[in-house]
Amino acid sequence: MAFIGAVLGMAAVVRSGEPSVWQPLAEEIVLFIDEAETRYRVGDARAAQRAVVEAYFGVFEDRKMEAAMRTTIGAKHTYLVEKQFGSMRKAIKSRENPDVVHEIAEGIRQAVRRDAEVLDRASVPAEVFKVNQ
């Protein structure tokens, strides 16, 4: 748990000195993707799929990173990132080689980190994307 706090803390400030909104969120997604990959490598495909679903629905979509990306970076780009989550889940379900799952996982990690930095540099606030405001 201390490790998670340290990772999130390191990503908590954008270069401009403003608090980071999206980079800590990206690191939460990465933790679920890491868990999915680890679970898959030890043979627990069901837990691996659940971790991917949690990364996507529980963090990426529910916490509005997807919406922020769609409006700031673009719908086509966001769709391609979203598609990677589905590809990882499908690769796990179809029992692909762990190296294939790793490649997809690495693509997700790179994409969410890169895009979180873009959102933070653009000073996109999370509050804009909350429902019923």
Model-identified regions with their sequence ranges:
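Sec/Tat signal peptide C-region and signal peptidase I cleavage site
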Residues: 10-15
